[in-house]
A protein has these predicted regions:
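N-terminal targeting signals for export/organelle localization
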Residues: 2-9, 13-104
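Thiol/selenol-based redox catalytic cores and closely related redox-interacting motifs
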Residues: 49-51, 59-64, 68-71, 75-90, ...
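Active-site-proximal beta-strand/loop segments in catalytic clefts of secreted hydrolases
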Residues: 129-132, 157-160, 188, 225, ...
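Glycine-rich adenosyl-nucleotide cofactor-binding module
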Residues: 97-127
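Conserved redox-active cysteine motifs that mediate thiol-disulfide chemistry
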Residues: 129-142, 163
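Short active-site neighborhood of thiol/selenol oxidoreductases, capturing the structured segment around
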Residues: 117-135, 153-156
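Conserved helix-turn-beta segment immediately C-terminal to the redox Cys motif
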Residues: 121-123, 141-161
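Sec-exported extracytoplasmic/periplasmic mature domains
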Residues: 41, 45, 139, 145, ...
Length: 247
């Protein structure tokens, strides 16, 4: 996990040398040279920084990209990885913010660009990053009726783990370009060949980018309504109990 966060941090810095036209500017510091954000911005000019804010620790700032979080010193010289825990309450402040960021990002993703399988009156809704060719994603989907029976509404976001210009990516595009997307997903997960041609107007790149922002390390990845993320396959009854306990 530490190595993953360092990669994310290095990626933030590397953006400065990438295509400037596609960069998202960092949080704008004030003109006051005593503002610590000036030093941080100077260390990573042009990097994609979604948010830079002070923490409860003097001189330590929180830097976010997607739902990934690292900490930097006020002078911008040092970076810290790991979770910030408030010992008095045992609250994981980093994870709390990650969850907020995930909820915000998923809320902004149109449900019309997801694949939704759910009962008429669901008790819970989860968002699942899935790969057509992932064995455990296929196992999860083979039990979709049981998830639904337990009151769980599943919203899929396609995340081809192999990335663009691969067979899994093409299959994902074929699913999203089908007249009946849900049926196409089920057929694809059963290993059936889809005849649909990929279309230009599909959300696969968008859902993949969201998964990248969430620093997914595999699929399936199940995101709860409160932003908690469970990596890997979770059986229907176990997920239902987890959701019930979290209410």
């Amino acid at each position: 996990m530490i190595a993953k966060k360092l990669v994310v941090l290095l990626a933030l810095c590397a953006v400065a040398n990438a295509n400037p036209a596609q960069q998202t500017p960092p949080t704008t510091p004030s003109a006051d040279p005593s503002d610590p954000r000036v030093a941080v911005a100077a260390r990573i000019p042009g990097a994609r920084v979604d948010e830079l804010r002070a923490t409860a620790i003097p001189g330590i700032y929180e830097l976010t990209r997607g739902s990934e979080i690292v900490y930097v010193t006020a002078d911008g010289k040092y970076a810290l990885t790991g979770d910030l825990v408030e010992l008095a309450t045992n609250n994981n402040l980093t994870e709390e913010h990650r969850r907020e960021l995930r909820v915000k990002a998923i809320s902004a993703f149109p449900e019309t660009e997801m694949l939704v399988f759910g009962p008429k009156d669901p008790k819970y809704t989860v968002t699942v990053f899935t790969d057509v060719d992932c064995p455990y994603c296929r196992k999860l989907h083979s039990q979709i009726a049981e998830y639904n029976r337990l009151g769980i509404r599943v919203r899929y976001l396609l995340y081809p783990r192999t990335g663009p210009n691969t067979t899994s990516w093409t299959k994902a595009e074929q699913v999203m370009c089908s007249a009946d997307r849900n049926a196409a997903l089920t057929r694809a997960k059963l290993g059936e060949e889809l005849k649909t041609k990929p279309c230009a107007d599909n959300p696969v790149a968008k859902s993949y980018a969201l998964g990248q922002d969430f620093a997914l390390e595999g699929t399936p990845a199940i995101v709860m309504a409160d932003g908690e993320m469970l990596p890997g396959y979770v059986p229907p009854d176990v997920l239902a109990q987890h959701l019930k306990d979290g209410k």
